[in-house]
Amino acid sequence: MSQSVSERTRIKSDRYESGVIPYAKMGYWDAAYTVKDTDVLALFRITPQPGVDPVEAAAAVAGESSTATWTVVWTDLLTACERYRAKAYRVDPVPSATDQYFAFIAYECDLFEEASLSNLTASIIGNVFGFKAISALRLEDMRIPHSYLKTFQGPATGIVVERERLNKYGTPLLGATVKPKLGLSGKNYGRVVYEGLKGGLDFLKDDENINSQPFMRWRERFLNCLEGINRASAATGEVKGSYLNITAATMEEVYKRAEYAKMIGSVIVMIDLVMGYTAIQSIAYWARENDMLLHLHRAGNSTYARQKNHGINFRVICKWMRMSGVDHIHAGTVVGKLEGDPLMIKGFYDILRLTELEVNLPFGIFFEMDWASLRRCMPVASGGIHCGQMHQLIHYLGDDVVLQFGGGTIGHPDGIQAGATANRVALEAMVLARNEGLDYFNQQVGPQILRDAAKTCGPLQTALDLWKDISFNYTSTDTADFAETATANR
């Protein structure tokens, strides 16, 4: 007697039985799995719902971020399902947390389209964050294999070429954000750019939300900025620039503004993270083809990066943006007004600047990773910093960084040019002291170096007097799980 259709399609297998079975039994958990060099690895912080086994929660994340759905489907048998299933292979309790677990998951590289951050993220963070079996989920780190990294462009210009273009070595770069960020006319905006560059800064920049508003259209801003840049460059003999924000409603408009910036002589353009991954990669390709630096403002990142138990750790965003092709990205200051644990910030900077990563748990780096010759990305420190913190900034952040003093330049009592000069003199004094072997980070030595430099620089003395008591000494909400490192200005 012939079998019925349902009988013929019911496969007797541990991993295939019609209906709903646990993810761990479907093949999404494999404690004996051997990680391959070509695997994409992801580390998730999982908070299971009460009563949900952590291993099953990890398997559910692996399944829902790769091939699974809520029930077994017979079409799995038409694929290489054993290969394409993501494998949760390790679950560890999070230190000092009673209900959180680190879940390590491996993905076959063929699950992702080459050179497509949008496709990668559609799987890794696309649907699984709303899964009912978990009450919170955070993507903490990823390892992108060499073979997959090679399909990405990486930074359009990179640190080495940027320094060659600026002819500036062995010191951080100096910048400032034009303030107020909204409301200035084009003429006054250009004046701020000129004064800051003339006073000693390398860059001025637009802020994240200045695009093309009724009080100042983008062409007006671009033209006045370039006039200020050219005048300051002629006066100082240095290569100068201003980050022109080309973020817009459509990619057609983004390209139009980028082409115009190039035509009038700009060396750098700027975009916002809120543009989206496809837009960021698209303009990064344009920047590489047109020999333009590309600055990224991380606008919007704290909506998903700041909370410790849910969202995406910023270190992952750093990896994605380096892959996408930006040259600059805001990555924290340690001592400024924005969130920033010292060790976590150092981890972000290492991800952007090193060619190879080693496991460093206090820095929050969970995977070894070779960057496959992708160029290095310049971190930007911005938000509530001033020249009185120069010894701390150099100690924590090193040389390959843009130090952006917005209020710390434009808020100077003697004017914008004086504020820029104060920052330039403070930086050069501290770099010289460091190069001479002085213990500049010492709380007595560092401030004294600045006071000595201020004896021959009135603007620096004024700045030190004005901001000497200003600090943002708060405990970070996001700290490393393997070290106690509350943010402190010391």
From Swiss-Prot:
The protein's required cofactors: Mg(2+)
Main location: plastid
Superkingdom of origin organism: Eukaryota
Site features described as Transition state stabilizer, chain residue numbers: 337
Catalytic activity: 2 (2R)-3-phosphoglycerate + 2 H(+) = D-ribulose 1,5-bisphosphate + CO2 + H2O; D-ribulose 1,5-bisphosphate + O2 = 2-phosphoglycolate + (2R)-3-phosphoglycerate + 2 H(+)
BP GO terms, sorted: reductive pentose-phosphate cycle
Alphabetized InterPro entries for the sequence: RuBisCO (IPR033966), RuBisCo_large_chain_AS (IPR020878), RuBisCO_lsu_C (IPR000685), RuBisCO_lsu_C_sf (IPR036376), RuBisCO_lsu_fd_N (IPR017443), RuBisCO_lsu_N_sf (IPR036422), RuBisCO_lsuI (IPR020888)
Record localization: Plastid, Chloroplast
Residues annotated to bind substrate: 127, 177, 181, 298, 330, 382
Residues reported in the UniProt entry to bind Mg(2+): 205, 207-208
Cofactor note: Binds 1 Mg(2+) ion per subunit.
Post-translational modification N6-carboxylysine, affected residues: 205
Active-site residues annotated for this sequence: 179, 297
Enzyme Commission identifier(s): 4.1.1.39
Keyword presence, Transmembrane helix: no
Pfam short name (any one): RuBisCO_large
Entry similarity comment: Belongs to the RuBisCO large chain family. Type I subfamily.
PANTHER family in the cross-refs: RIBULOSE BISPHOSPHATE CARBOXYLASE (PTHR42704), RIBULOSE BISPHOSPHATE CARBOXYLASE LARGE CHAIN (PTHR42704:SF17)
Purpose: RuBisCO catalyzes two reactions: the carboxylation of D-ribulose 1,5-bisphosphate, the primary event in carbon dioxide fixation, as well as the oxidative fragmentation of the pentose substrate in the photorespiration process. Both reactions occur simultaneously and in competition at the same active site.
Protein name: Ribulose bisphosphate carboxylase large chain
Lineage: Eukaryota, Sar, Stramenopiles, Ochrophyta, Bacillariophyta
